[in-house]
């Protein structure tokens, strides 16, 4: 029994090492540019070992995306509770979720760079709905969170709910995440421009909130 437990622990550690090696390479270059052979070398194992864990590159990419967003969501939940959680009104929750994207830019630019490349890769590879299900479940929790905020706004009136829910989601959190991703990749400023664009995201947050927050006069 002890050997079985040890084997399982070693397999889990090796799998995690392969995923982290892939993440480093994907974030530094792009998903398309990195081969499985390079990932195996980065992880310090042979390619045959890698194939024991991941039959195809999309398998590795999707599991990696699923794991990274689940880890980030756990961070968001912890910060959400520290900020007041469900005691916040809808406007305060929207402020929090925009701040969570800013924190993602500050602390996890590698995830933003990976994410910017992920969608194009899985479309190009024609990944099936079955393959994508774990990933979609991992990221859909953010949309469910927004749905809760929108319902709260309907009740407390602190956000402009004359804007349909999906439209508001796409044009606030989704758009904000997209801009943060472009900043992380250095796409919106020249290479010799500012390296930390947190202030630009804070400005954009103020613009977004100014357009949708409703306070009693």
Regions found by a protein language model. Give the residues of each.
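N-terminal intrinsically disordered/low-complexity leader segments
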Residues: 1-13, 80, 216-217
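Short secondary-structure transition hinges
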Residues: 103-147, 166-167
């Amino acid at each position: 029994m002890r050997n079985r437990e040890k084997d399982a622990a070693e397999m889990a550690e090796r799998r995690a090492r392969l995923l982290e090696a892939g993440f480093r390479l994907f974030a530094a270059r792009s998903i398309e540019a990195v081969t499985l052979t390079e990932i195996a070398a980065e992880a310090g194992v042979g390619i045959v070992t890698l194939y024991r864990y991941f039959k195809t590159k999309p398998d590795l990419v999707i599991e990696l995306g699923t794991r990274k967003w689940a880890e980030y969501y756990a961070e968001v939940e912890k910060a959400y509770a520290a900020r007041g959680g469900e005691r916040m009104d809808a406007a305060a929750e929207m402020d929090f979720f925009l701040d969570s994207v800013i924190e993602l830019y500050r602390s996890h630019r590698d995830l933003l760079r990976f994410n910017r490349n992920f969608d194009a890769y899985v479309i190009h590879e024609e990944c099936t709905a079955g393959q994508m299900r774990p990933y979609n479940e991992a990221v859909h929790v953010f949309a469910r969170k927004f749905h809760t905020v929108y319902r709260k706004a309907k009740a407390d009136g602190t956000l402009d709910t004359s804007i349909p829910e999906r439209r508001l989601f796409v044009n606030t959190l989704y758009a904000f995440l997209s801009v943060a991703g472009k900043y992380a990749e250095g796409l919106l400023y020249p290479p010799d421009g500012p390296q930390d664009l947190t202030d630009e995201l804070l400005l954009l947050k103020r613009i977004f909130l100014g357009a949708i927050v409703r306070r009693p006069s």
